[in-house]
Structure formats: C-alpha cells, structure tokens
C-alpha cells in the first residue's frame, strides 16, 4: 500500500499494473523532452536579437507539424496495447462478483455453490493494533495468487467504483449493469483499495481489501467459509 509522503505508484502486484507504471515512465520521458525543448527555444529567443525580416519558413512549419504527430503516435501505441490488455479476459480460474451498496461491498464466488459475504469497514474503535484506519474490513476478499481472476462488478443502489491501485484495477459499479475486469496477483499479500466514485455521505468508509494467497490456503479458506 502507499506510504506517507509517497510520490510514486504503489508497488505493482499484477502484470497490468507493471505495464501502467512502464507507460507512465515512458510518457514522463516524452513530456520532459518536450518541456526541455520548449525552455531551450524560449531561452534562445530571449537571448538572441530578433530580426524583423519576414521569410517563408516552410521547413519549420513542416517540422512542427510532423514532430507532434510522431510524439502522439509514440504515446498512443503503448496506450492502446494496455487498453486491449485490460479488456482481455482469457479463461479465468475464478469468477468473483462485487456488488456495491451504501456503504459496504457484497461478494459472491460464483464458482462455488454457497460462498458469499458482506464486507464492512472495521470502525476505528474496534480496530486491532497495527491495522490501518479506514482501510480494514471484517471480511477480506481472498483469491489464489498467479491465477486469472475475473471480477463482475455492479451496484445495488447508486454509482460506486471498485478500485485496487496495486492491482491496476478500477471499474465502475453501475446499478442494473454488469461490468467486468480481470487481474492476476503475482505475489502473496494484502492489497488495499477504496470506492472511487462519490456515492454519498459515507463514501470514504467503503474500503476494499484483497488478500492473495497460495492455492492450498485459498482452498482451505473457501472450505471453512462454505462450511460456516
């Protein structure tokens, strides 16, 4: 999760997030190059004497037309690749349904006969020592690591948004509509997110906690939860 005074992204825990971080660095390099060029030209114009001679500058016009087009292509190609990757859902090992409510989340594991629960934020007064304020929940979403997970997202009342930054996931939850996304958790851990669509007075109290575990631990957890 994010640390205090952190300026960069959270550590990537999925292939999609790794691609997003690389694209951010790529776009930042392009932006810095453009800013450096503009600042150099401004400094050059300020220090050099200007000539009032009007000349035909077809070469300059050609350069400032073609160069921005090349820059846009360099930004568009990796962006389109990531967009297609985010929309691709290829034979998921597990399907999870997330339903947004005011102000909690409900989860259903559709591959299991009877595995569903509600996930509420733990109030600050009940929070154990060492846990994170406004981010901990009473029931975490547990998924097997290194497995394709499909998440079907909807809402039961107003607009919500299911977002876990370290997994590179953010999908709107819309009443009467099913949206879907997917991710692969590449390492074990606990990943925190929050509702990312203003949904009412307690919008800030809708945390999301995804716990990635090895497959044997997930199977044990699902068996115990189904039995209870």
Curated annotation (Swiss-Prot):
GO MF terms here are: copper ion binding; cytochrome-c oxidase activity
Note whether DNA repair occurs among the keywords. Answer: no
Segments on the Mitochondrial matrix face: 46-58
* Stored PROSITE patterns: COX2, COX2_CUA, COX2_TM
Name the positions where Cu cation A1 binds: 160, 195, 199, 206
- GO CC terms for this protein? mitochondrial inner membrane; respiratory chain complex IV
This entry's Enzyme Commission designation comes to: 7.1.1.9
* Protein residues bound to Cu cation A2: 195, 197, 199, 203
- What chemistry does it catalyse, as a reaction equation? 4 Fe(II)-[cytochrome c] + O2 + 8 H(+)(in) = 4 Fe(III)-[cytochrome c] + 2 H2O + 4 H(+)(out)
Entry-linked Pfam families? COX2, COX2_TM
Is the keyword Transferase assigned to this protein? no
Q: What cofactor does this protein call for?
A: Cu cation
Location comes to: Mitochondrion inner membrane
Identify its membrane topology class.
Multi-pass membrane protein
Give the quaternary structure. Component of the cytochrome c oxidase (complex IV, CIV), a multisubunit enzyme composed of 14 subunits. The complex is composed of a catalytic core of 3 subunits MT-CO1, MT-CO2 and MT-CO3, encoded in the mitochondrial DNA, and 11 supernumerary subunits COX4I, COX5A, COX5B, COX6A, COX6B, COX6C, COX7A, COX7B, COX7C, COX8 and NDUFA4, which are encoded in the nuclear genome.
What is the role of the protein in this entry?
Component of the cytochrome c oxidase, the last enzyme in the mitochondrial electron transport chain which drives oxidative phosphorylation. The respiratory chain contains 3 multisubunit complexes succinate dehydrogenase (complex II, CII), ubiquinol-cytochrome c oxidoreductase (cytochrome b-c1 complex, complex III, CIII) and cytochrome c oxidase (complex IV, CIV), that cooperate to transfer electrons derived from NADH and succinate to molecular oxygen, creating an electrochemical gradient over the inner membrane that drives transmembrane transport and the ATP synthase.
Q: Which family does it belong to?
A: Belongs to the cytochrome c oxidase subunit 2 family.
Record's protein name: Cytochrome c oxidase subunit 2
- Source organism of this protein record: Cairina moschata (Muscovy duck)
* Underlying gene: MT-CO2
